[in-house]
């Protein structure tokens, strides 16, 4: 279905919707009763459904954000020093945190840094694939898996744990991908290293290593 293919193409929508002029027009249209009525009649997106706003400053494009880009050799040297720290964490930003609510990911980063945990982002990540999987579009899921897993596996090999602030993304990497690709050793390694942020922080708390002084 055309509508389903569009709304599950989160990378594409995010990239387009975050463009300065398009961003303002789209956010205004999503609040317009007339435009919402048009969407309801043409794409069957209910006129009263709450649609997220899009930022014109995606997290991965913000100055000062530390991200790992395998195509840029200098990106490792520009990291927060995670390679020299006992707690090494990579944040999978997710489409939602990158294009809709960067403040969520920024809060995770601040919380981890408050606990002296060096954290970096994956600069060339793609959607986790959960929206496409819910459509049964396994071809797209495989394509997204092949784009994400090698990047994350490289971080796991260097001793990083991985976290994501969106639960469905955590579920995708920890449970769904291993079920879909049971013979993929890289998928297994990434799944074993993937944590919900609070799960990771609670593991520190149990070891009495969590800084709760704010």
PLM regions and their residue ranges:
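Iron-sulfur cluster-binding electron-transfer modules in prokaryotic oxidoreductases
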Residues: 1-214
